[in-house]
Regions:
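Terminal alpha-helical segments
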Residues: 1-113
Length: 113
């Protein structure tokens, strides 16, 4: 059922050079417990890149790659959310753009799987 996605997330977590071992442990535990929002927060704390956090944030643990592609195709809907974050100054315009770029990059990765 989410086999391939779980492996990808595991690989991302294992291969990332983390700044904080505690945040890493918390991110992994939260992901395993299904608390994806907390997993993302902890992943950012552990120094994950925008692309890696996108993978966690959108937690599309799908039964098939085709389903994943369809779901990730909707990442373009993030643009209004990113705009809101920019206006609230929760994140810089550059960070918001990196998140959007990461979603496009991840779509390409999925297409090649």
């Amino acid at each position: 059922m989410g086999f391939h996605t779980n492996i990808s997330v595991g690989a991302v977590i294992q291969n990332n050079k983390l700044r904080s071992q505690q945040s890493y442990s918390d991110a992994l535990r939260a992901f395993q417990e299904g608390d994806y929002n907390m997993s993302v927060i902890k992943a950012y704390g552990a120094g994950f890149s925008a692309a890696e956090a996108i993978l966690l944030a959108h937690n599309y643990i799908a039964p098939s790659k085709r389903d994943m592609l369809t779901r990730f195709g909707h990442l373009r809907l993030m643009e209004p959310v990113m705009e809101k974050y920019r206006k609230m100054e929760v994140m810089s315009e550059e960070e918001a753009q990196r998140v959007l770029d990461a979603s496009e990059w991840f779509m390409e990765v999925l297409k090649r799987m």
